[in-house]
């Protein structure tokens, strides 16, 4: 969703990541999948199962693999060494105010209790300052006390294009401007250029994940998404084609893409913002499936690594809860109907839309129960730590299935392994 932070537009990360489950019997040693033109792996977990192929992707890019190029039991072994707090921390994305990573965040990273960090415009003053901050995080992650030290942190931001960019540089065109280009083939070229440009830009800053592209199909001029030109088009076929091009180009550039906000916020009016208050999208199930969810089919086929789920309520999809707290939507729609096998990610856990759902720890528990893999604690390190506490307690008590929990962490590590440090 969209919020203001540090005097600039800040889109709260709303992405849902979920990649299947690695079993110990992945690939017999020696694992040399990268040398094979086609690698097929069965991924299991949280009710998802898929065969993953690398046949059509660019060699050497993260798009070429849905799991690490060298498949082994390394992630499984790493997970087996983790404490409850470390397991919980791998599922939390932290944010922090200001220009310097707080000492508490660095301590948590050194202890192996952080999965990633999100950056906003308020974290940026200059290239040298920002890259120094990234270096501090990377140095902490390399600590010998961190069992996940061999796995790069998920370092992400919202670099959508146009007005919604946290860092200077590409992509300069907004989604709406790209969607207005004629013919469609030219717009597809522009979307690919935006994806590859964003990837190169983020990599130059040391980041490896982007909370983009937006796949919402907006309805009217001035709507929530259209206000900042965050939607490609009112036509789902156009959003589908351009979003998939962006995803492929970005991931060929070794940056994980995140499509959002499933199952769609395109019908939200200019006054409807889940960051601020509850939002209900009163569309029929048929409209949501055939229009709003439509672009996700192509993104999934393109191998998108992450999906962010909306905090809006969609009563005609069988739930009175926000989508990210609803197994009917996360499991029923995204996984079972559309066949998504990747990682899921929440929007900001501190969103106003969740006011009725209690503490950060309780919201986190409800999201995890619904099938959300990564929790976005973007407001502060304290908020991220509260999310960690909720997950740790649920693991300890068995409120969340421990085997499934470890499987999610294994898949998070698999994604991190596939990304450049």
Mark where each language-model region is.
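N-terminal hydrophobic targeting/anchoring segments and the immediately downstream early-domain regions
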Residues: 2-166
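Mid-to-C-terminal alpha-helical segments outside catalytic/metal-binding sites
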Residues: 390-393, 399-421
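Second-shell loop/turn segments in exported
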Residues: 62-65, 94-99, 119-126, 177-193, ...
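Glycine-rich, aromatic-flanked loop segments that form ligand/cofactor-binding clefts
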Residues: 141-173, 195-218, 239-264
């Amino acid at each position: 969703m969209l919020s203001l932070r540090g005097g600039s537009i800040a889109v709260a990360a709303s992405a849902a990541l979920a990649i299947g489950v690695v079993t110990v019997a992945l690939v017999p040693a020696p694992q040399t999948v990268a040398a094979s033109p086609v690698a097929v792996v069965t991924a299991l977990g949280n009710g998802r199962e898929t065969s993953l192929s690398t046949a059509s992707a660019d060699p050497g890019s993260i798009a070429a693999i849905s799991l690490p190029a060298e498949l082994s039991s390394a992630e499984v072994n790493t997970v087996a060494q983790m404490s409850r707090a470390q397991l919980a921390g791998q599922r939390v994305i932290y944010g922090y105010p200001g220009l310097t990573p707080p000492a508490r965040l660095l301590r948590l990273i050194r202890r192996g209790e952080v999965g990633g960090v999100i950056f906003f415009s308020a974290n940026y003053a200059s290239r040298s300052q920002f890259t120094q901050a990234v270096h501090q995080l990377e140095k902490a992650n390399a600590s010998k006390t961190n069992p996940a030290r061999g796995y790069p942190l998920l370092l992400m931001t919202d670099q959508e294009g146009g007005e919604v960019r946290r860092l200077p540089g590409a992509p300069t065109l907004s989604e709406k401007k790209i969607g207005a280009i004629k013919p469609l083939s030219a717009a597809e070229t522009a979307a690919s250029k935006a994806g590859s440009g964003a990837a190169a830009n983020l990599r130059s800053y040391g980041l490896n994940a982007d909370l983009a592209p937006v796949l919402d199909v907006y309805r009217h001029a001035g709507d929530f998404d259209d206000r900042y030109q965050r939607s490609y088009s009112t036509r789902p076929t156009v959003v589908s084609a351009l979003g998939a091009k962006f995803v492929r180009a970005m991931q060929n550039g070794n940056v994980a893409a995140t499509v959002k906000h499933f199952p769609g916020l395109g019908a939200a009016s200019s006054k409807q913002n889940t960051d601020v208050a509850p939002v209900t999208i009163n569309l029929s199930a048929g409209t949501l499936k055939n229009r709003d969810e439509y672009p996700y089919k192509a993104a999934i086929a393109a191998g998108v690594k992450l999906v962010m789920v909306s905090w809006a309520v969609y009563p005609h999809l069988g739930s009175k809860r926000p989508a990210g707290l609803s197994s009917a939507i996360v499991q029923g729609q995204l996984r079972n109907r559309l066949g998504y096998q990747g990682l899921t990610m929440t929007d900001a856990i501190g969103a106003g839309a969740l006011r009725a759902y209690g503490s950060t720890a309780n919201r986190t528990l409800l999201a995890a129960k619904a099938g959300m893999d990564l929790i976005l604690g973007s407001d502060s390190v304290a908020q991220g730590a509260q999310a960690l506490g909720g997950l740790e307690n649920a693991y300890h008590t068995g409120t969340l299935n421990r085997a499934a929990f470890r499987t999610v962490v294994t898949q998070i590590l698999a994604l991190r392994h596939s990304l450049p440090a």
